UniProtKB/Swiss-Prot annotation:
Family named by the database record: Belongs to the UPF0270 family.
Taxonomy, superkingdom: Bacteria
Protein name: UPF0270 protein HI_0956
Pfam families: UPF0270 (PF06794)
Coiled-coil portions: none
Amino acid sequence: MIIPWQELEAETLDNIVESVILREGTDYGIEELSLNQKKQLLLTQIRNGIALIVWSELHESIDIKNKTEFLKQECKEQECQMN
């Protein structure tokens, strides 16, 4: 289930982003970025619609996914065809 980031309290959104970064050990390229820099990059992707906050009922967990990849996977799981 996609969670609209606009409906989250600012502190909640910040905590989700930080949790995902710390859990995933996200790689941002050759130069290592600070936690704050990583958070700002991920928040920008969320606000620009590039990334989605997703709740998994199966795993009872929250994650942040690339929008295109998430929608492809959802379509694949539902056996639908993308236009």
